[in-house]
Amino acid sequence: DYRLAWSPSPGRSDEIVIVEMDEESFSQPELNIWPWPRRFHAQVLRNLAAAGASVIGVDMILAGTSSNVQCPPGQDPFFWTPPLSPDDEALVSALKDAGNIVLAMEVVQEEVGGDEASGELIAANFPLPEFEEAALALSSVNLPKDLDGVARRYLTSVTHQDVVWPSTAIRLVSVHQDL
Protein backbone atom coordinates (compact mmCIF):
# COMPACT_ATOMS: atom_id res chain seq x y z
CA ASP A 1 0.00 0.00 0.00
CA TYR A 2 2.79 2.45 0.88
CA ARG A 3 4.76 1.69 -2.26
CA LEU A 4 1.72 2.54 -4.38
CA ALA A 5 1.01 5.70 -2.40
CA TRP A 6 4.57 6.94 -2.97
CA SER A 7 4.75 5.93 -6.64
CA PRO A 8 4.56 8.76 -9.17
CA SER A 9 1.29 9.02 -11.04
CA PRO A 10 1.38 8.20 -14.73
CA GLY A 11 1.13 11.16 -17.08
CA ARG A 12 -2.19 12.42 -18.33
CA SER A 13 -3.47 11.18 -21.68
CA ASP A 14 -5.80 12.98 -24.04
CA GLU A 15 -6.68 9.61 -25.57
CA ILE A 16 -8.65 8.40 -22.55
CA VAL A 17 -11.71 10.12 -21.14
CA ILE A 18 -13.49 8.83 -18.05
CA VAL A 19 -17.09 9.90 -17.57
CA GLU A 20 -18.16 9.10 -14.05
CA MET A 21 -21.32 9.38 -12.02
CA ASP A 22 -20.17 11.26 -8.95
CA GLU A 23 -21.54 13.45 -6.17
CA GLU A 24 -21.45 16.49 -8.45
CA SER A 25 -23.59 14.61 -10.98
CA PHE A 26 -26.17 13.75 -8.34
CA SER A 27 -26.26 17.36 -7.12
CA GLN A 28 -27.82 18.42 -10.45
CA PRO A 29 -31.61 18.64 -9.92
CA GLU A 30 -32.44 16.72 -13.11
CA LEU A 31 -29.98 13.95 -12.19
CA ASN A 32 -30.80 13.65 -8.49
CA ILE A 33 -32.57 10.30 -8.93
CA TRP A 34 -31.39 6.70 -8.88
CA PRO A 35 -31.35 4.66 -10.89
CA TRP A 36 -30.93 7.11 -13.71
CA PRO A 37 -33.42 6.52 -16.50
CA ARG A 38 -31.79 4.54 -19.27
CA ARG A 39 -32.53 7.37 -21.71
CA PHE A 40 -29.89 9.39 -19.76
CA HIS A 41 -27.33 6.64 -20.38
CA ALA A 42 -28.40 6.46 -24.04
CA GLN A 43 -27.82 10.19 -24.46
CA VAL A 44 -24.37 10.02 -22.87
CA LEU A 45 -23.43 7.15 -25.20
CA ARG A 46 -24.73 9.06 -28.22
CA ASN A 47 -22.72 12.13 -27.18
CA LEU A 48 -19.52 10.10 -26.76
CA ALA A 49 -20.01 8.39 -30.13
CA ALA A 50 -20.71 11.74 -31.83
CA ALA A 51 -17.52 13.13 -30.26
CA GLY A 52 -15.54 10.42 -32.07
CA ALA A 53 -14.77 7.92 -29.29
CA SER A 54 -13.02 4.90 -30.81
CA VAL A 55 -14.45 2.63 -28.11
CA ILE A 56 -16.81 3.23 -25.18
CA GLY A 57 -16.81 1.09 -22.03
CA VAL A 58 -19.74 0.91 -19.63
CA ASP A 59 -18.65 -0.61 -16.33
CA MET A 60 -22.07 -1.06 -14.73
CA ILE A 61 -24.16 -4.15 -15.35
CA LEU A 62 -27.35 -3.21 -17.16
CA ALA A 63 -29.37 -6.25 -16.10
CA GLY A 64 -33.14 -6.35 -16.20
CA THR A 65 -35.57 -4.00 -17.85
CA SER A 66 -36.60 -0.66 -16.45
CA SER A 67 -40.23 -1.51 -17.24
CA ASN A 68 -42.73 -1.29 -14.39
CA VAL A 69 -45.09 -3.80 -16.01
CA GLN A 70 -46.29 -6.47 -13.58
CA CYS A 71 -46.32 -10.15 -14.46
CA PRO A 72 -49.77 -11.07 -15.82
CA PRO A 73 -51.94 -13.37 -13.67
CA GLY A 74 -51.42 -17.01 -14.50
CA GLN A 75 -47.86 -16.47 -15.78
CA ASP A 76 -44.90 -17.87 -13.88
CA PRO A 77 -42.84 -14.76 -12.95
CA PHE A 78 -39.65 -16.83 -13.10
CA PHE A 79 -40.14 -17.50 -16.82
CA TRP A 80 -41.89 -14.25 -17.77
CA THR A 81 -39.88 -11.43 -19.29
CA PRO A 82 -41.32 -7.92 -19.06
CA PRO A 83 -41.35 -5.86 -22.24
CA LEU A 84 -38.66 -3.27 -22.84
CA SER A 85 -39.58 0.21 -21.71
CA PRO A 86 -39.15 3.20 -24.05
CA ASP A 87 -36.00 4.06 -22.07
CA ASP A 88 -34.64 0.54 -22.66
CA GLU A 89 -35.45 0.85 -26.37
CA ALA A 90 -33.55 4.17 -26.46
CA LEU A 91 -30.52 2.46 -24.93
CA VAL A 92 -30.68 -0.46 -27.39
CA SER A 93 -30.83 2.06 -30.23
CA ALA A 94 -27.84 4.03 -28.88
CA LEU A 95 -25.81 0.81 -28.47
CA LYS A 96 -26.55 -0.29 -32.03
CA ASP A 97 -25.98 3.13 -33.56
CA ALA A 98 -22.59 3.60 -31.87
CA GLY A 99 -21.39 0.09 -32.70
CA ASN A 100 -18.35 0.45 -30.44
CA ILE A 101 -19.70 -0.04 -26.93
CA VAL A 102 -18.38 -2.66 -24.52
CA LEU A 103 -20.77 -3.59 -21.71
CA ALA A 104 -19.98 -5.06 -18.30
CA MET A 105 -20.62 -8.52 -16.91
CA GLU A 106 -19.38 -10.11 -13.71
CA VAL A 107 -18.73 -13.58 -12.44
CA VAL A 108 -19.96 -14.16 -8.90
CA GLN A 109 -17.63 -15.97 -6.53
CA GLU A 110 -18.53 -18.15 -3.60
CA GLU A 111 -16.35 -17.35 -0.61
CA VAL A 112 -14.16 -20.08 0.82
CA GLY A 113 -13.11 -19.59 4.43
CA GLY A 114 -14.28 -15.97 4.41
CA ASP A 115 -11.97 -15.11 1.52
CA GLU A 116 -13.68 -14.12 -1.72
CA ALA A 117 -10.35 -14.22 -3.57
CA SER A 118 -10.07 -17.97 -3.09
CA GLY A 119 -13.69 -18.57 -3.98
CA GLU A 120 -15.12 -20.69 -6.74
CA LEU A 121 -16.67 -18.91 -9.72
CA ILE A 122 -20.29 -20.03 -9.57
CA ALA A 123 -22.57 -17.71 -11.55
CA ALA A 124 -22.51 -14.71 -13.84
CA ASN A 125 -24.49 -11.48 -14.09
CA PHE A 126 -25.01 -10.38 -17.67
CA PRO A 127 -26.66 -7.36 -19.25
CA LEU A 128 -30.20 -7.67 -20.55
CA PRO A 129 -30.03 -9.88 -23.68
CA GLU A 130 -31.22 -7.04 -25.92
CA PHE A 131 -28.38 -4.84 -24.61
CA GLU A 132 -25.84 -7.64 -25.00
CA GLU A 133 -26.91 -8.24 -28.61
CA ALA A 134 -26.69 -4.51 -29.43
CA ALA A 135 -23.26 -4.03 -27.84
CA LEU A 136 -19.95 -4.68 -29.57
CA ALA A 137 -18.67 -6.94 -26.78
CA LEU A 138 -18.80 -7.78 -23.08
CA SER A 139 -16.04 -7.50 -20.50
CA SER A 140 -15.53 -8.55 -16.90
CA VAL A 141 -15.72 -5.98 -14.12
CA ASN A 142 -14.58 -8.45 -11.44
CA LEU A 143 -12.31 -6.76 -8.91
CA PRO A 144 -11.45 -9.01 -5.97
CA LYS A 145 -10.98 -7.38 -2.58
CA ASP A 146 -8.76 -8.50 0.23
CA LEU A 147 -10.10 -9.24 3.71
CA ASP A 148 -9.75 -5.57 4.66
CA GLY A 149 -12.00 -4.58 1.74
CA VAL A 150 -9.21 -3.05 -0.35
CA ALA A 151 -8.72 -4.12 -3.98
CA ARG A 152 -4.99 -4.72 -4.48
CA ARG A 153 -5.16 -7.11 -7.41
CA TYR A 154 -6.60 -6.85 -10.89
CA LEU A 155 -7.93 -9.81 -12.83
CA THR A 156 -7.06 -9.61 -16.52
CA SER A 157 -9.81 -12.14 -17.23
CA VAL A 158 -12.28 -14.52 -15.61
CA THR A 159 -13.62 -17.83 -16.87
CA HIS A 160 -17.21 -18.93 -16.57
CA GLN A 161 -18.60 -22.09 -18.17
CA ASP A 162 -15.47 -22.46 -20.32
CA VAL A 163 -15.75 -18.92 -21.71
CA VAL A 164 -12.91 -16.51 -20.97
CA TRP A 165 -14.12 -12.96 -20.34
CA PRO A 166 -11.36 -10.33 -20.56
CA SER A 167 -11.32 -7.47 -18.10
CA THR A 168 -12.79 -4.15 -19.19
CA ALA A 169 -9.32 -2.60 -19.55
CA ILE A 170 -8.06 -5.48 -21.71
CA ARG A 171 -11.19 -5.48 -23.89
CA LEU A 172 -11.15 -1.70 -24.39
CA VAL A 173 -7.48 -1.65 -25.37
CA SER A 174 -7.95 -4.59 -27.75
CA VAL A 175 -10.88 -2.86 -29.48
CA HIS A 176 -9.06 0.49 -29.61
CA GLN A 177 -5.94 -1.16 -31.08
CA ASP A 178 -7.95 -3.40 -33.45
CA LEU A 179 -6.40 -6.51 -31.88
Predicted regions and their residues:
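Non-transmembrane functional regions of envelope-associated proteins
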Residues: 1-179
